[in-house]
């Protein structure tokens, strides 16, 4: 199966090279593949033994297009995309504002013929999903496309899911779901043979009731819908659409879930582009005023923490990837850290190594916290920190992070019963990566900072093995930005 999958990925991706010469980006190509594969699968579903009502209007099916060549093929494909963009339901969402970006008719014909040769419906969802995930990863690897910011390393996603241990008939949300990686990992975990052996009702709920997603970027939203569809999540011909399009931070969506697994987009500030009186475009900080938020701020990640707290059930649990600044930023950052300690059980922080994200120099962490019923007592008693960053170095190509690299953290986390944990750090073993801190210790720290490290960084003492220049530059820029924001906050306070 692996050979078949990799062969199809190679075939499909091999078509992209000549398209690149015509100025078609990886993202555009992946979008066109989404449209074409969907049309082919709909054609297969319309035939025996399925005989489904696909919703594709007569005259605009795969069969109406697949035998054409040249200008006729281009014209039919263009007309098909326009017609389908006018449809309702999930069909209209996938094809919204769809246009043909493959101007070379000969290459379009070759792609259509290549897709036509495969029986997509009879392929297992594992194979289809792996093919599409493979293409999404190749798209993420294209630095120019910027798609990497929507792609969380799959080993990290799987580790987060294993720590949360989702159960059947429970709901899972990702408020910025990108291409759907967290949902697919949760589905894989739930359907692993021998784990739960789900009955018919549980399987139906997994398909149509488990997942609640949102995505801000239209093209990524389409890729996500297709990715979930290929993995048998949601009903493309029904009313169940597991993902919505829009700014998830604008309002409380109303639903409450058992688990949140997410990696909010990198970048501190939310902003909107405005046109001033002189006709010039300016960016203004976007501030969300929501009654359910603890504090008003333009910091995107801090707002996501508040949003996640809202959508969790009273006993809900979350695992969230967040940048370092969330751990130490003053002002709103300190308020939110204190609120997390007081109202949730913030029990675990995984400090991530650099070199695992497609955006260079990113320093991030995974925060694990459980929501608790309202109480005057501080809910967080101890915070366990696993330092997976100091003296750990990965690269995307030569030395990528694997599932095996996260096994020690999962063992320390002890998902079976996290109340039975043992530190690996001690005065006798100062390089132990797993260490416990009491809430009292944290509250005594300047600004209630959670930016804690204790292992000696060997690279700082070894001038021949300094961090990558991009990483150093990113650190300098981040430190300057943090200093500037602190000065700005001080100035605002002095004006009062």
Predicted ranges, named:
Residues 257-258, 362-368, 399-404:
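Short, surface-exposed amphipathic charged segments that create phosphate/polyanion-binding patches used
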Residues 271-299, 324-332, 353-359, 374, ...:
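Short, contiguous acidic/charged loop-to-helix segments that flank catalytic cores in large enzymes
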């Amino acid at each position: 199966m692996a050979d078949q999958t990799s062969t199809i990925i190679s075939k499909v991706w091999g078509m992209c090279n000549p398209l690149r010469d015509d100025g078609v980006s990886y993202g555009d190509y992946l979008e066109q593949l989404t449209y074409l594969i969907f049309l082919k699968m709909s054609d297969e579903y319309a035939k025996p033994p399925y005989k489904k009502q696909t919703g594709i209007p007569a005259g605009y099916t795969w069969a109406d297009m697949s035998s054409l060549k040249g200008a006729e093929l281009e014209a039919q494909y263009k007309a098909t995309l326009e017609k389908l963009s006018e449809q309702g339901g999930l069909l209209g969402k996938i094809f919204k504002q769809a246009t043909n970006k493959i101007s070379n008719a000969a290459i379009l014909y070759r792609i259509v013929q290549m897709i036509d040769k495969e029986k997509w419906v009879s392929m297992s969802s594992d194979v289809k999903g792996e093919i599409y995930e493979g293409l999404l990863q190749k798209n993420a690897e294209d630095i120019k496309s910027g798609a990497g910011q929507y792609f969380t390393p799959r080993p990290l996603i799987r580790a987060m899911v294993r720590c949360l241990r989702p159960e059947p008939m429970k709901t899972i949300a990702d408020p910025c779901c990108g291409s759907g990686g967290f949902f697919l990992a949760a589905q894989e975990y739930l359907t692993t043979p021998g784990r739960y052996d789900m009955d018919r009702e549980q399987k139906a709920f997994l398909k149509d009731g488990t997942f609640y997603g949102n995505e801000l970027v239209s093209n990524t939203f389409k890729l996500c819908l297709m990715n979930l569809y290929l993995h048998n999540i949601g009903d493309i011909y029904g009313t169940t659409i597991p993902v919505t399009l829009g700014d998830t931070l604008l309002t409380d969506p109303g639903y409450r879930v058992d688990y949140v697994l997410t990696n909010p987009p990198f970048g501190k500030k939310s902003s909107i582009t405005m046109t001033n009186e002189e006709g010039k475009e300016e960016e203004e900080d976007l501030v969300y005023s929501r009654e359910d938020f603890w504090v008003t701020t333009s910091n995107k990640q801090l707002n996501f923490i508040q949003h996640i707290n809202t959508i969790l059930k009273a006993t809900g649990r979350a695992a969230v990837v967040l940048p370092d600044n969330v751990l130490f930023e003053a002002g709103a950052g300190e308020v939110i850290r204190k609120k997390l300690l007081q109202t949730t059980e913030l029990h675990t922080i995984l400090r991530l190594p650099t070199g695992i994200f497609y955006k260079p120099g990113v320093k991030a962490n995974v925060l694990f916290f459980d929501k608790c019923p309202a109480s005057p007592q501080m809910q967080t008693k101890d915070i366990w920190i696993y330092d997976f960053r100091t003296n750990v170095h990965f690269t995307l190509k030569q030395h990528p992070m694997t599932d095996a690299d996260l096994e020690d953290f999962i063992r320390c986390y002890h998902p079976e019963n996290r109340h039975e944990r043992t530190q690996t750090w001690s005065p006798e073993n100062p390089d132990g990566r797993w260490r416990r801190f009491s809430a009292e210790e944290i509250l005594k720290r300047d600004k209630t900072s959670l930016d804690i490290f204790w292992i000696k960084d060997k690279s700082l003492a070894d001038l021949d093995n300094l961090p990558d220049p991009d990483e150093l530059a990113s650190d300098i820029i981040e430190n300057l930005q943090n200093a500037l924001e602190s000065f700005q906050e001080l100035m605002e306070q002095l004006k009062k």
